[in-house]
Amino acid sequence: MTLDEFKQNVASGKIKDKWYFYKRTEDNKNALVRDMSSLTEFIKDKFNLDIYFVYGTLLGVIRENNFIEHDNDVDFAYISKQTNTTEILHEFYGLCAILKNHDLLSKICGNGHIHVYSPNKRNKFDLWTSFILNDKFSLVPLFDSTLNSSLILPLKQITFKTKNFLIPNQAENFLNATYLDWKIPLLETKGTINPWKKIL
């Protein structure tokens, strides 16, 4: 399926309209990026946690220096500071509680995955939990101690649409481990190598 065919299917109702990025103006995307940056600052200030791009957002930034046109959400992850899964979950639900107190928690989707609002509440983002145990990296919901931590750490800073964000240390290798043929746009499938699984 080409992007034009995808757009036609959205227009005809064959594909549900989820306000995909191709429908957004540049001004809207730039406002979204400002809200993304505000969230990274909020999480750093309140929790001393760095959040970084993962999944489709990282793919778009690396492949196109843009959002993927047929995507419709933003994916961040944070790296837990804890050293076992019990503490990681305790930290996660503590994070949820504080976000709820600030009226920024939209939904707990499962252990290690939430929908969180930007501080101005104009936009909502996916926030996933990642952690490193015994030098092995895990990320909800695809990676369960299957990657070396050197693929992720140290996180690297990039500039995306005038704002600074963090990405995995070896972003292309991370994408190689995540997606089938990630350098080629695939509209029919997310193309992930691993199935979703329960990590926490």
Enumerate the predicted regions with their spans.
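Active-site nucleotide-donor binding segment shared across nucleotidyl transfer reactions
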Residues: 43-74, 85
